[in-house]
UniProtKB/Swiss-Prot annotation:
Ranges in coiled-coil conformation: none
Signal peptide residues on this chain, from the entry's feature table: 1-24
Protein name per UniProt: Protein CANDIDATE G-PROTEIN COUPLED RECEPTOR 7
Membrane topology term: Multi-pass membrane protein
UniProt xrefs under InterPro entries: CAND6-7_N (IPR054103), GOST_TM (IPR053937), GPR107/GPR108-like (IPR009637)
GO BP: G protein-coupled receptor signaling pathway; response to molecule of bacterial origin; root morphogenesis
Protein localization: Membrane
PANTHER family: LUNG SEVEN TRANSMEMBRANE RECEPTOR, RE59932P
UniProtKB keywords: Developmental protein, G-protein coupled receptor, Glycoprotein, Membrane, Receptor, Signal, Transducer, Transmembrane, Transmembrane helix
Family statement: Belongs to the LU7TM family.
Organism: Arabidopsis thaliana
Pfam families recorded: CAND6-7_N, GOST_TM
Gene designation per UniProt: CAND7
Main location: membrane
Spans traversing the lipid bilayer: 175-195, 207-227, 243-263, 281-301, 315-335, 363-383, 390-410
Length: 440
């Protein structure tokens, strides 16, 4: 094997250790003129009834070295468990020319020596996984200066007691039921919110309608996720539900960030329109969320086998961090403005109650972002592969709690201290906004 660059070793460690388990377990892809010494296809949690099927066709190996006929046994597919990953990396670091196909820590599937002779050059075989574990499917090219082209079809599944195939990993087979349950929770939440708005029509503002829309989109996103995982579970492919899932996920994320920003600015119930700097936050966040969702689709629908997969992960992470920071600014501006206003307008008690509410909202938003971005990732990393569903459940529970708290704090109610703004306050705020003197 050619000397493996350190970056490839890091990529192998990062991708196999932290790659989220694949969700569409029948995949077809094309590799064209690829010279990478190792390609990670996907990750899957197997039970003792697990199977993996790999089909390749239209295989060609082009050598740019003096040897036009590379040794076929030095190119092949294998499975690698997470426990064995560090051992393989240690072998590679000790001997950069070491071929991973020679390691006794990997589960060999086949090499190019098993292919049918040209011009067909194809292979199709199913393998039982007798040792339950979470495995990563790799292709290794241990021949220096060679480029490989091939069409690859992979199929991974576990068998249920009744003999049917379950294409979801061992730790994700509960997801259809989980998402269906939270869909019902949000439908009930939407019904209760609609009733609350109806019974308090006099204090309903445009932001409350956006909040209702957020609940509706979140519900649709969850039912699409449930159907997506259900069809993947029984057939191996999402049957188009993944398209609807990504559409509603995009709308939900953009709407959630928009609602948080607008609540933080006090739009519609504290002032009738936004200042220029608040509009700029929306102008920045919404396009970034478009980019983040494009990255999410590329990450979810392809895999680490594409050359730019790590780059897309980095783009998604960077954009998400920027958006999370951006939505904090309007809340901070509002807190600062209320603190300054309370010193001069003679309404210290009223401003103090609003200031307290904004501080509480700030803490709630920070807690939500911290848990969903850091704690959930930690759960996915440390949880055993059979219990990956726990991290998804934790994320949905925290999201639901966040929605309930946020909606309760800013509900349409006569006695809600945040909305109880008398006429002279509204006129003063509108005048200050027109003069661009009301810093928020």
């Amino acid at each position: 094997m050619a000397k493996m660059p350190l970056s490839v070793v890091v990529f192998l460690l990062f991708s196999a250790a932290f790659l989220a388990v694949s969700m569409a377990e029948i995949k077809s892809l094309v590799i064209s003129d690829d010279a990478r010494p190792m390609i990670l296809f996907e990750k899957f949690g197997f039970t003792h009834t697990g199977h993996v099927t790999v089909s390749i066709s239209s295989v060609s190996v082009v050598s740019t070295s003096s040897d036009p006929n590379p040794e076929a046994s030095r190119l092949g597919f294998f499975l690698l468990s997470e426990e064995s990953l560090l051992q393989v990396l240690l072998e590679i670091q000790q001997n950069p020319r070491f071929c991973v196909l020679d390691s006794h820590y990997v589960t060999h599937l086949f090499t190019f020596r098993d292919l049918s002779p040209p011009p067909n050059s194809r292979f199709n075989q199913s393998y039982p996984v007798t040792s339950p574990n979470e495995y990563s499917l790799f292709f290794a090219n241990c021949v220096p200066e060679t480029k490989v082209s091939m069409a690859v079809r992979t199929e991974m599944y576990n068998k249920d007691p009744n003999g049917s195939k379950d294409y979801l990993p061992a730790g994700s087979t509960q997801l259809p039921t989980l998402y269906s349950f939270f869909f019902l929770c949000y439908v009930a939440f939407l019904g209760f919110w609609s009733y609350t708005c109806w019974t308090n029509k006099q204090t309903v503002h445009r932001i409350h309608l956006l909040m209702a829309g957020l609940l509706l989109i979140k519900s649709l996103n969850l039912i699409c996720a449930a159907e997506d995982k259900h069809y993947v579970k029984i057939t191996g492919t999402p049957h188009g539900w993944d398209i609807l899932f990504y559409i509603f996920q995009f709308i939900r994320v953009v709407l959630l960030f928009t609602v948080i920003i607008l609540i933080g600015t006090g739009w519609s119930f504290l002032k009738p329109f936004l200042q220029e700097k608040e509009k700029n936050v929306l102008i920045i966040v919404i396009p970034l969320q478009v980019l983040a969702n494009i990255a999410s689709i590329v990450i979810g629908e392809t895999g680490p086998f594409i050359k730019d997969w790590v780059t897309w992960n980095q783009v998604f992470l960077l954009v998400d961090i920027i958006c999370c920071c951006a939505i904090i600014f309007p809340i901070v501006w509002s807190i600062r403005s209320l603190r300054e206003t309370s010193k001069t307008d003679g309404k210290a008690a009223r401003n103090l109650s609003k200031l307290t509410l904004f501080r509480q909202f700030y803490i709630v938003v920070i807690g939500y972002l911290y848990f969903t971005r850091i704690v959930v990732f930690a759960l996915k990393t440390i949880a055993a592969y059979k219990y990956q569903w726990v991290s998804f459940a934790a994320e949905e529970i925290v999201s639901l709690v966040f929605y309930v708290i946020m909606f309760h704090m800013f509900r349409p109610e006569e006695k809600n201290e945040y909305f109880a703004v008398d006429d002279d306050e509204e006129e003063a705020a509108a005048l200050a906004l027109r003069d661009e003197e009301f810093e928020l």
